[in-house]
Amino acid sequence: MNTFKKIACSFMALAVVVGCTACASKTFDHKKAVKFCEDEGYEMYDDAEDYADAFNEIIIGDRPGDRAYIHAVKDGAQDVYDSVFNRFEAYPECDVNEATSFIFFDDDVFVQGYVLTFDEVKYAEKIFKDYARRFKEDGEDGEEKGYSYFIREIRYSDNMKLYCGIYQKNNSILFIQCNYKKASMVDGICEHFGVISPSEA
């Protein structure tokens, strides 16, 4: 092999390594979550405590039709994890760098979602595995396009289904829950984030 070819091959190998490293370092995108909320008319909250109050009011049905979301970093992100995502202390204590959460509840539809970015990959892995283990009897797991997933579809009645999906990509988690009679809503949300829908479970 002549010198030119050796140099060309070296650059190609380097490009592959760099490309793979870039792919491996990607996490779920908070900007996508914020755009989804803006497009769907969710009310933005700046303060994690105010958002937690709104979340609790919406989830028990005191504010039918309301939509709320928050995007927070550092201490605010930690507060979102502690007081909203992990409000029942079902998951371990984790150090969170960035968090986006959204919720919508009306008579016949319920939607909640989270994008969480942690200090370390081990936190994301722990939460993903805990959730999958807890609901392994009625879910399906796998890997696709650089992320792991665990999805569930449960029929409550002819007029209501529960769709849940948790997705891990490196040190980040995406969680989506949707209660609705049709798969179209959760399918649309998952398409926005580029992940497999729980309706495929």
Kindly give the residue locations of the regions a language model identified.
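Bacterial N-terminal signal peptides that target proteins for export
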Residues: 1-11
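C-terminal motif of bacterial Sec signal peptides marking the signal peptidase cleavage site
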Residues: 19-22
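Short, compositionally biased low-complexity segments enriched in polar/charged residues
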Residues: 44-111, 123-127, 152-155
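Short Gly/Thr-rich strand-loop-strand
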Residues: 121-170, 185-201
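A short acidic/glycine-rich loop-to-helix N-cap element
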Residues: 176-188
